Amino acid sequence: MQTIALVDDDRNILTSVSIALEAEGYKVETYTDGASALEGLLARPPHLAIFDIKMPRMDGMELLRRLRQKSDLPVIFLTSKDEEIDELFGLKMGADDFITKPFSQRLLVERVKAILRRAPARDAAAAGVAGAAKSADAPSRSLERGQLVMDQERHTCTWKSEPVTLTVTEFLILHSLAQRPGVVKSRDALMDAAYDEQVYVDDRTIDSHIKRLRKKFKMVDVDFDMIETLYGVGYRFRESA
């Protein structure tokens, strides 16, 4: 059974969303503030987390920032219509998706399913998933482009043999670019590679993910410049690495 962590100080949302997710067969763990959520998420990593932004003790943005220092756990944010700036900041911090309040329970469930379909099988020790140890021994599907190595089965990425931790969305965007070096991928093409059809994202979402990818690789190699921007067209991965 897959576990979803739900973090919100609104108990009505906790109750209604929990019911909707449990009806789909998920186990739900709830938290009412960011501080207790951080402790629980690190001690008992779920398969996916859903955060509100405005919460006591620690808001959702700070929770995500601290979580990203130790985990690439998929995260969906719940936002209000007037929190566009927060949404852009959250994408830069590594959020996988946003849902604007008020929202339908069906929409949220579909977003959860979409991200979990894209996410790799999580380690048994991290998520308590039966059979995960078996998948860890399965043959890997790796993509090698010069100094870049991406393993889809294990959701690992290295540059010059140094590990680079990526979220599910970042991994899929980079994998799409690296599959065909030198070929320009439009933002629409990258959206199709990283998101299910029912999930709407705009150009700024892809741009934010690209910025974060570059930042992560530059932390490993300050000279990293393999992702090129072709203004008005899209992005491409350089042919030589």
Swiss-Prot record:
GO molecular function term, any single one: phosphorelay response regulator activity
Q: Which Gene3D superfamilies match?
A: 3.40.50.2300, 6.10.250.690, Winged helix-like DNA-binding domain superfamily/Winged helix DNA-binding domain
Which annotated residues bind Mg(2+)?
8-9, 52
Residues that bear 4-aspartylphosphate: 52
One BP term from GO = polysaccharide biosynthetic process
Under InterPro entries, the record lists: CheY-like_superfamily (IPR011006), OmpR/PhoB-type_DNA-bd (IPR001867), Sig_transdc_resp-reg_C-effctor (IPR016032), Sig_transdc_resp-reg_receiver (IPR001789), WalR-like (IPR039420), WH-like_DNA-bd_sf (IPR036388)
Which keywords label this protein? Cytoplasm, DNA-binding, Exopolysaccharide synthesis, Magnesium, Metal-binding, Phosphoprotein, Transcription, Transcription regulation, Two-component regulatory system
Cofactor annotation comment: Binds 1 Mg(2+) ion per subunit.
Which residues form the DNA-binding region? 140-239
Described function? Member of a two-component regulatory system ChvG(ExoS)/ChvI involved in regulating the production of succinoglycan.
Q: Which protein is depicted?
A: Transcriptional regulatory protein ChvI
What taxonomic lineage is listed for the species of origin?
Bacteria, Pseudomonadati, Pseudomonadota, Alphaproteobacteria, Hyphomicrobiales
* Gene label: chvI
